[in-house]
């Protein structure tokens, strides 16, 4: 069990954020300039400042604009907005101008003051789409984080990608490995203990209720969900021997996919039709990534780089993984590759870069970075070749999902 824990609980970090602060690397492309104009007349100065900061940061992270403070509206884009607050309700009007001419106007309403970061994210996402620029549909998606709250206890929280919004969803006991269950993000799976037995639960955010899916001795973790949401890839160890299983939520049928005397964990669907699975195995004597068809028990090595590849996430034919660098003590970098090509792209350069997760459109990757005594949530904009960092503080991270 110690080896199992070593693979799943790779490293612990810290979590908390005030107004998001962006650090950007790999910049240099000339982008169109955009001015942000806040016409709000709010008495809540903290909300006013925080909302403005999020809008500015979202525009930067979109990698479509260079945000400028002093420029003429007649020759640049303008993001002009008015935010109003009425009790616990927010209303937002956004006008996008190009060269002084209106390009789009949208009005939004949000019931739930604490969720204001998502209102900002949604408005930037819609504005980018209205201008026909590279989409950022992932921007208003939620992140699930399991974090240690005390000895042998952990919480599952839901957050926006800047970590400005955080809400505890599951508390009490040991709650681990949250995994979104559908693209609408209305439910997720997680592992907890029922009378000291590892149990997989499904949590419905519409009803705020958890239901039991299945239990297993040793461990049970949902590592991936099929595109249609009907099947789970589950790591189970009923005889203290972790293997990857396929669980059909409709038929309740459980199929063992791997059968190796060592460790097979963290299965992820890969391919456009979810017909293959990649997983982490120690069958070479160290953690590495393998692949096999769902209807076959023959596994093939996928990654031929590094000697400790213990985290993986997939999008269609692509996979992203964290790899320990040889001859660099404690350094883990994130790499991107396709199962249809030998090309490997290094995405990070130093420190410990862990928990990589693809966005819903595959164009971005979120991860946790540790560098010395500092830690941050990183967002890699793959096509723009940019990485943005948001500071993390307080609370140890056990796992994340996006």
UniProtKB/Swiss-Prot annotation:
Signal peptide: 1-17
Primary localization: periplasm
The UniProt record lists the keyword Cell cycle: yes
Any Gene Ontology CC annotation: periplasmic space
Compartment(s) of residence: Periplasm
Keyword Metal-binding included in the entry's annotation: no
InterPro entries on file: 6-blade_b-propeller_TolB-like (IPR011042), Tol-Pal_TolB (IPR014167)
GO biological process: cell division; protein import
Domain of life: Bacteria
Residue ranges of the TM segments: none
Keywords of this entry: Cell cycle, Cell division, Periplasm, Signal
Assembly behavior: The Tol-Pal system is composed of five core proteins: the inner membrane proteins TolA, TolQ and TolR, the periplasmic protein TolB and the outer membrane protein Pal. They form a network linking the inner and outer membranes and the peptidoglycan layer.
PANTHER family per the UniProt record, alphabetical: PROTEIN TOLB (PTHR36842:SF1), PROTEIN TOLB HOMOLOG (PTHR36842)
Stated family: Belongs to the TolB family.
Function recorded in the entry: Part of the Tol-Pal system, which plays a role in outer membrane invagination during cell division and is important for maintaining outer membrane integrity.
Protein name: Tol-Pal system protein TolB
UniProt organism field: Campylobacter jejuni (strain RM1221)
């Amino acid at each position: 069990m110690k080896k199992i824990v070593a693979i799943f609980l790779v490293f612990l970090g810290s979590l908390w954020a005030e107004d998001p602060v962006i650090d950007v690397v790999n910049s240099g492309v000339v982008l169109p300039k955009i001015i942000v104009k806040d016409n709000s007349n709010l008495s809540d100065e903290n909300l006013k400042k925080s909302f403005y900061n999020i809008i500015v940061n979202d525009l930067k992270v979109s990698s479509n604009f260079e945000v400028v403070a002093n420029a003429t509206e007649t020759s640049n884009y303008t993001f002009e907005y008015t935010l109003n607050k009425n009790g616990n309700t927010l209303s937002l009007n956004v006008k996008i101008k190009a060269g002084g001419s209106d390009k789009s106007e949208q009005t939004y309403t949000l019931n739930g003051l604490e969720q204001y970061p998502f209102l900002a994210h949604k408005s930037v996402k819609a504005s980018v789409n209205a201008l026909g620029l590279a989409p950022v549909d992932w921007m208003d998606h939620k992140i699930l984080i399991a974090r240690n709250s005390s000895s042998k206890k952990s919480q599952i929280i839901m957050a926006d990608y800047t970590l400005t919004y955080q809400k505890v969803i599951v508390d009490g006991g040991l709650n681990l490995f949250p995994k979104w269950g559908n693209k609408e993000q209305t439910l997720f799976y997680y592992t907890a203990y029922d009378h000291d037995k590892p149990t997989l639960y499904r949590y419905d955010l519409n009803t705020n209720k958890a239901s039991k899916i299945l239990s297993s001795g040793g461990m049970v973790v949902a590592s991936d969900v099929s595109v249609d949401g009907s099947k789970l890839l589950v790591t189970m160890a009923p005889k203290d021997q972790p293997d990857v299983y396929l669980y059909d939520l409709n038929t309740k049928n459980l199929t063992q996919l791997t059968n190796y005397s060592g460790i097979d964990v963290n299965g992820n669907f890969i391919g456009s039709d979810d017909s293959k699975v990649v997983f982490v195995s120690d069958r070479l004597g160290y953690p590495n990534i393998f692949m096999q068809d769902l209807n076959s028990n023959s596994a093939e090595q996928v990654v031929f780089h590094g000697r400790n590849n213990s985290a993986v996430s997939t999008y269609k034919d692509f996979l992203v993984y964290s790899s320990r660098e040889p001859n660099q003590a404690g350094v883990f970098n994130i790499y991107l590759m396709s199962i249809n090509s030998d090309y490997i792209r290094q995405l990070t350069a130093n420190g410990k870069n862990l928990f990589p997760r693809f966005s819903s459109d595959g164009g971005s990757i979120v991860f946790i970075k540790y560098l010395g005594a500092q830690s941050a949530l990183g967002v890699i904009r793959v096509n723009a070749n940019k990485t943005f960092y948001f500071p993390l503080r307080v609370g140890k991270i056990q796992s994340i999902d996006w």
